[in-house]
Amino acid sequence: MKSVEEQLALIKRGADELLVEAELVEKLKRGQPLRIKAGFDPTAPDLHLGHTVLINKLRQFQDLGHQVIFLIGDFTGMIGDPSGKSATRPPLTREQVLDYAETYKSQVFKILDPAKTEVAFNSTWMDKLSPADFIRLSSQYTVARMLERDDFDKRYKSNQSIAIHEFLYPLVQGYDSVALKADVELGGTDQKFNLLMGRELQRAYGQEPQCILTMPLLEGLDGVKKMSKSLGNYVGIQEAPGIMYSKLVSIPDSLMWRYFELLSFRSMEEINGLRADCEAGANPRDIKIKLAEELVARFHGEEAAATAHRSAGNRMKEGELPDDLPEISVAAIEDMPISAVLNKAGLVKNAAVARDLLASGGVRIDGEVVDRSFIVKLGATHVCQAGKKAFGRITLVSDESSK
């Protein structure tokens, strides 16, 4: 096992906040594997790279010799996490949650070592709690303290409804830490309230409180809003290798170091070396290719990564992407057909030219040929090629003034 200092450096890599660092140091000094918990509510079947920020950190803990608990919130998934929500979230059925959970497991083991991972379902202990147990759990926290949470506070002050079951969510997530005897819990920055709840409940139930490590929410391909499938600015880990590769190679230069730190398993020394190369004049696209190859290989294998790289090179033979790819924002109030986007972005002379190019296979989005049925989602960013010489990284931005 590495020294405490070496472990701490890797644990803190890319992290937003570690509470309480001195407590974690004491836990590490004992020289025993720690129990590292991260919970995931399976609310959708497919994961994207934003979800993997936490999973990557779990893998780093595994590599340091600690015990990782991948907690599937099949019970909490039926409540619906209210974190950051402005309205009550509709609950899922048990069948939906279990179906999604199976797809999660097949995806996360592309990152985690199955032999070193304990998969747990919080229904295992939550289904066994009696009404009296639930009342005891609820008595550990007050409504006033719940309303200190930013999203609840905003809804309360604006006279929006807050259902009682939403107050239960952070209590149940906190109780998961009691049931699992967690030493450390990971979560996104939007989960801090829930993670701190785990510390408080562990104290209330006579346990040593867990440390918490919050990780940032990964920006999507637009480099602005958090990665989200609904915004169209995501990279799905089950997307075809070529699409994943093309999306990653086309991210803004300003975003690539953030992606390296949070998504790559390269050491920070190696990443800093790449940064120095870039500052010395290396083409940023060549650096992004290294990131794209690494991530495609992780989820699809080395051969698929090599094929994606070759295919991307072949696709660009007749129209090499310029180093100074123009950034173009197109205002819209809703999703828009690609023909209209190309026209508004100025990549074609008029709508008729756009239709002709689409019909003849002359339009590529993120390196892939598309037809007139392709719809650009509001908030999405794509590298677009119209014909042989017209290129642009186009973002469909919300035109609030038109609403």
Curated annotation (Swiss-Prot):
The protein's name in its UniProt record: Tyrosine--tRNA ligase
Cellular localization per UniProt: Cytoplasm
Quaternary structure and interacting proteins, as annotated: Homodimer.
Alphabetically ordered keywords of this record: Aminoacyl-tRNA synthetase, ATP-binding, Cytoplasm, Ligase, Nucleotide-binding, Protein biosynthesis, RNA-binding
Taxonomic lineage from the root: Bacteria, Pseudomonadati, Pseudomonadota, Gammaproteobacteria, Pseudomonadales
Motif mapping: 'HIGH' region: 42-51
Top-level division of the source organism's lineage: Bacteria
Boundaries of every S4 RNA-binding domain copy: 336-396
